[in-house]
From Swiss-Prot:
Native species: Xenopus laevis
Subunit structure: Homodimer.
Record protein name field: Alanine aminotransferase 2
Positions of post-translational N6-(pyridoxal phosphate)lysine modification: 358
NADP is among the record's keywords: no
Gene Ontology molecular function terms on file: L-alanine:2-oxoglutarate aminotransferase activity; pyridoxal phosphate binding
Length: 540
């Protein structure tokens, strides 16, 4: 301790401050900054008898938050849509910018349903109203049509201080919730919607997680089980991992265009009841990542099943505007529920979700959405309102955009023709790209792609040779991750492995969006087809 003594002015008393005369070795500095801790790492007692934490090998105080001490549920969370493939894609983009030579000139991110990032232009009316709400001085600009100004003025009038910079009510701005209710009534053929049952949210994801928080409870065999489709959107598995709920998988029927089979629901439920308490059934319609659109009969069967088995029904309907295939139509679970009569409409508990991020608008960055709850216990509804109040309110610009989506221009109004033209152009283009994706992928030996009936994705099944499977396993990778990483490194095409969404054992898939511009999508599909053939030749 001679170095220590020689480096100090004064003595170490229990409450004395330490003054340095000269720079000490780092280990000693750390020791001095962590009073009364042993240089050997042995815990020492403070004057009050409390034991301090050990020092780490590098002489610094041990961290409170480590992988061992953190919430273990967080470590179980996985989100493939922004996982290792996407991280590598970002690295490749930077390498290209630095002039590193690659077999491609750009990275095409076909991994996520972000329409504007893929080049889709905003719908004029949506942005005009948003612009005036953000900067009300634009009311004086004669470039903006009168219906745009009227819409913006109505929204601003409902905001605190007539500014979207003010907090809103936690459930969302009342006039916007009223407009959402009217939209639902129009969509569902006049079935009433109560604005008090509507909760605006930060995209649909926020309200889905909020609802799951309310539903999850119990321990051991009484722990809440949540039934989710496989393949599924990874938000669900991630949220269930974070909440330490039990994930109950039911498999969609790939041989029947990813249809939902009631017998499979019964199998999954019976199996789950052996080890948990299944209380929730989640449906994604149109499907993500699978792109199927459920028939009305299927929805009726699901409602009967949920009622018979006393399950809370969650209907993720964010792709309700994205239906392309002939003979397919979107039917909301609420509409079908009420048309089935009081036996179901007065008893079945339902939460349904919608978003500004998908559809024809694709406004992901605004983070707007809503949830409608049906037949919720009033006491629980009070708890739901309390829970959303903790986060103060959803982003007000997102609420504004949602209002414009659910309350668009009407025939005869100045903006109507342009609005309808732009909306239909986007949906027609998506329908053509859905057809194109199925057609080109099915030309490749070893790739099978079901029809993309709706949503924004294709989820083709790929054959992976046994040699590649063994190599992937040796590297600790899922075979489709191995395939997708090779695809990225050799072509610059970024897609998501099917293993990130769940799939039947022994099958391999990937998810890709249909959002790139048509010419780029054609090129992407042809390159993907060629790569798969090369991959098959190399590993067969």
């Amino acid at each position: 301790m001679s170095i220590l003594r020689g480096s100090l002015r004064g003595v170490l008393a229990p409450n004395a401050s330490v003054v340095f005369r000269s720079r000490l070795p780092p280990q000693l500095t750390s020791a001095l900054l962590c009073p009364l801790r042993s240089l050997s790492g042995t815990p020492l007692a403070e004057p009050d008898g409390k034991v301090t934490r050990k020092m780490s090998e590098n002489g610094t105080c041990n961290r409170i938050l480590t992988l061992d001490s953190m919430n273990p549920c967080i470590q179980k969370v996985e989100y493939a849509v922004r996982g290792p493939i996407v991280i590598r894609a970002v690295e490749l983009e930077k390498e290209l910018q630095q002039g590193v030579k690659k077999p491609f000139t750009e990275v095409i991110k076909a991994n996520i349903g972000d329409a504007h990032a893929m080049g889709q232009k905003p719908v004029t009316f949506l942005r005009q109203v948003s612009a005036i709400c953000l900067y009300p001085e634009l009311m004086n600009d004669n470039k903006f049509p009168e219906d745009v100004k009227q819409k913006a003025a109505r929204i601003l009038q409902a905001c605190g201080g007539h500014s979207i910079g003010a907090y809103s009510a936690s459930q969302g701005i009342e006039v916007i919730r009223q407009d959402v209710a009217k939209y639902i009534e129009r969509r569902d053929g006049g079935i009433l919607s109560d604005p008090n049952n509507i909760y605006l949210s930060t995209g649909a994801s926020d309200s889905i997680v909020t609802m799951l928080k309310l539903l999850v409870s119990g321990q051991g065999k009484s722990r809440t089980g949540v039934m989710i489709p496989i393949p599924q959107y990874p938000l669900y598995s991630a949220a269930l991992a974070e909440l330490d709920a039990v994930q109950v998988n039911y498999y969609l029927d790939e041989e029947n265009c990813w249809a939902l089979d009631i017998n499979e629901l019964r199998r999954a439920l019976a199996e789950a009841r052996k080890h948990c308490d299944p209380k929730v059934l989640c449906i994604i319609n149109p499907g993500n990542p699978t792109g199927q659109v459920q028939s009305r009969k299927c929805i009726e069967d699901v409602i009967r099943f949920a009622a018979e088995e006393n399950l809370f029904l969650m209907a993720d309907e964010v792709y309700q505007d994205n239906v392309y295939a002939k003979g397919c139509a979107f039917h909301s679970f609420k509409k079908v529920l009420f048309e089935m009569g009081p036996k179901y409409s007065e008893t079945l508990e339902l939460a349904s979700f919608h978003s500004t991020s998908k559809g024809y608008m694709g406004e992901c960055g605004f983070r707007g959405g809503y949830m409608e709850v049906i037949n919720m216990d009033p006491a629980v509804k009070q708890q739901l309102t309390k829970l959303v109040s903790v986060r103060l309110c959803p982003p007000v610009p997102g609420q504004v955009l949602l209002d414009v989506i659910v309350n668009p221009p009407k025939p005869g109004e100045p903006s109507y023709k342009q609005f309808i033209s732009e909306k239909q152009a986007v949906l027609n283009n998506l329908a053509e790209k859905a057809r194109l994706t199925e057609e080109i992928l099915n030309q490749a030996p070893g790739i099978r792609c079901n029809p993309v009936q709706g949503a924004m994705y294709s989820f083709p099944r790929i054959h992976i040779p046994e040699k590649a499977i063994k190599l992937a396993q040796a590297e600790g990778q899922a075979p489709d991750m191995f395939f997708c990483m090779k695809l990225l490194e050799e072509t610059g095409i970024c897609v998501v492995p099917g293993s990130g969404f769940g799939q039947r054992e022994g099958t391999h898939h990937f998810r890709m969006t249909i959002l790139p511009p048509t010419d780029k999508l054609k090129s992407l599909l042809e390159r993907l087809k060629d790569f798969h053939q090369k991959f098959m030749d190399e590993y067969s």
